[in-house]
Amino acid sequence: MKVLKTLLILVFILGLLGCDEEPKIANTVSTFYFIRHAEKDRSNPENIDPELNQKGLGRAMHWAEILNDVAVDAIYSTDYERTQMTAAPTAVKKNITVQYYDPESIDIEQFKADNINKRVLVVGHSNTTPDFVNKMIGKEKYQQIDDLENGSLFIVEIVNGIATDIRLNFNCNCPD
């Protein structure tokens, strides 16, 4: 009986020691790279879905080089020629199938959940890209991009639900 009592006390003490630490919370880190499509062909103002012009094709290749050392897990693009063509060089280089999204109906929380612990490239437009970034960071920080500006890179990192962001600008000395 004395042995059983000692054994129970020992098990109880070991149990208390095992409960000393609070459970560890797994770190989650998701990084999103937002860009606007590269320069589009403006030769036909009636064309609502133009392709990229020569400079835009160069910039699309430039983005692929900039993102070369980033282990991109997913690429999203709107369903337009200019955004698809901007995403294509990076998608080919990384062997990733581009997924399409509708900026008007995307569920931001679901998008975050679907891409937890991933590095994601998102290609959008002058109005949708800053809006998407604002929704991801939970504040109205960025305004619509000027229609002639195609070199902004917004990086949003979400660590354990807390978002940080930065906007970088890249020049492209691509031929016209």
Show where each model-derived region lies:
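Bacterial N-terminal signal peptides that target proteins for export
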Residues: M1-L8
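A structural signal for alpha-helix termini and helix-coil/disorder junctions
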Residues: V3, G138-K139
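Short, linear, compositionally biased motifs with a strong N-terminal bias
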Residues: L10-I13
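C-terminal motif of bacterial Sec signal peptides marking the signal peptidase cleavage site
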Residues: G15-G18
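Active-site-proximal alpha-helix that buttresses catalytic centers in soluble enzyme cores
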Residues: E21-K24, T28-A113, T129-F132, K139-L153, ...
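Generic beta-sheet signal
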Residues: F32, I116-G124
